[in-house]
């Protein structure tokens, strides 16, 4: 099933998930078993038009962004700043020891665990997301606020295995951004900090892609931290959408970033729709509401109660109201940075200092002088009339318009295919299947409530048959004990549904799917267990009563005597408690829902790094070379001459012979745009150099000395600040030649090399509709080869894809810092910023 999106339109974030993820949660993660018919022809045209308009407005406000929407992919240790010099993000690859992430993953996977039953009931792959640590629970129906999450409460012993990862992450945060770490550390209440860190809460996500959002509820004067704990995948980079940059992350990588900037995940880079992949990530943050007065008063109330009960295990004697700062939950202001290959390289931490100052100077020069950019790289940063952007209809949508949320009237749709699907899945509510997900106590409540209702239905049916032996339809008495037993059974079923979805807010389409299966299960039980005739109860009757339950149940409750109202409330609480005590990942059972104990920090224990022979968090953070002041300071101005070497492919004696180009829509897209036509008509850009000389030619541009040389030529033993290898690898063959080429020219760069190449992959390769992708693949190599041959006068051309080029860079002993994509380039040009690997 193709990727879909769960659309959640609400004013407030669902606090069972990371606050601020309030508009979309993508599928690959959320798939509805009934999505293909829930919004079918039963919706009239006017309603569909209104729903479509609302859907499109929501998509505009909170879209998904793909990799092609961003100009830069950061891979190495990176400090990215906005135009005012404020740090927006710090990427640190391989930041965490693998043993720490492995230990934490073993525990935190349980926080997002879903059983196979959930997928069986609703189809697809479960959206796995959960919270750990402490949470305020405001805006949720949970009565007791400002406390441990249920996961932490139920996994006290296992929780300790997360502490090394917490310590390493906190130490990295402190080393990189010490001022913000101190502010956050000073604000977080001691009762809710996780293991002495400035974090109160973790959000754990598995197989999760987010749309553009800001994190509502995070501490304004701090940074959030994202770490990938485990996984096998490509793509899903964290993108800062207003800045056009992505941070590529793999297991053990850490990203410190301003969570109040709009950010999202790019697409999964897997061409097969059913590709196997997994990714477990963790967000560390301080939930600012935990430091506000209502929560502080709750801590004090619990402490006072514990003292009155003469508790002997108190971890605190008093609660301090700290300065929590001003937390507006507003998006951060955006100060865009014009992006060039030089500004991209200047963000590399390895190039800080003198190199970054030079790169910043070069960035300013090419911004002021577009012809200098063309002189250096062969084309401008952006070509307005070049390779056209993909139209939306050419791309596989993340979402389906059929998922538009409609007004919900309770119950379920009675279309034929929906009823058939419900009947096919009714057995998932059988006792033996429920036991796979829920504890014995809750399954017993379900069984007892179900049996009680069926007994009352049987008794009523037998009475109706005695009165009228020819009766074929059951008559439902709304004032009978059977009706109240049905509502009680619905209360149990509702908790079953909440458990299956992990206590997150349930989409109305999912809810309809569930109630359809519930009704089919009961209708089948009426036939096979108490001997009613086919259709005597019927799906329609049960649907009517389910709508009555969803919209009329509270009215009946208010009409009941006070003592009956109280009994019903207690009953619902009893059901919820039983469901929450279901064993997940062998957790210890606990009465989390009613827990009022002052149990803050009771789970905390010290980690003995020396005894375990683990690197200390402080020493681990020192590996990255952050100065005492952190990464805040911007680089100074460059002085003196900057030397740049441009290496060009040597032209052959003649242009590639004109060949017959394919004719298709994709071929026309590549060959007939105005920029491509200019390349075909212009003189090759490397003809100006003398082909008879193997020596370099020097051009002076202010304090920039530019040498140009053909591949194979000599520079007389000189070293250069920067080397630009302009489309050299496309002129090499086999595996050995490109590696030798890379080794030779990158060795002449003091700081870094720009490897500029044609990328045969379409920028939307992984999300192109199959028919478009196939047509593109059939013509791309011959078309781009013709354009390259016209540009560089080459007979033989060997164009490659980004994955292939990255492999060459790695095998040649170089490290990739970033990739820059030239927007609209007729050659689909990319520039890789690489440097020699330190020995």
UniProtKB/Swiss-Prot annotation:
Fe cation binds at residues 213, 215, 263. It catalyses: thymine + 2-oxoglutarate + O2 = 5-hydroxymethyluracil + succinate + CO2. It comes from the Eukaryota. Pfam families: DB_JBP1, Tet_JBP. It is found in: Nucleus. Binds 1 Fe(2+) ion per subunit. CDD domains: JBP. The record marks 548 as: Involved in J base recognition, conferring specificity towards J-DNA. Monomer. Binds to DNA as a monomer. Dioxygenase that catalyzes the first step of DNA base J (beta-d-glucosyl-HOMedU) biosynthesis by converting thymine to 5-hydroxymethyluracil (HOMedU). DNA base J is a hypermodified thymidine residue found in the genome of kinetoplastid parasites, which is localized primarily to repetitive DNA, namely the telomeres, and is implicated in the regulation of antigenic variation. Also specifically binds to base J-containing DNA (J-DNA). This is Thymine dioxygenase JBP1. It comes from Trypanosoma brucei brucei. The gene is JBP1.
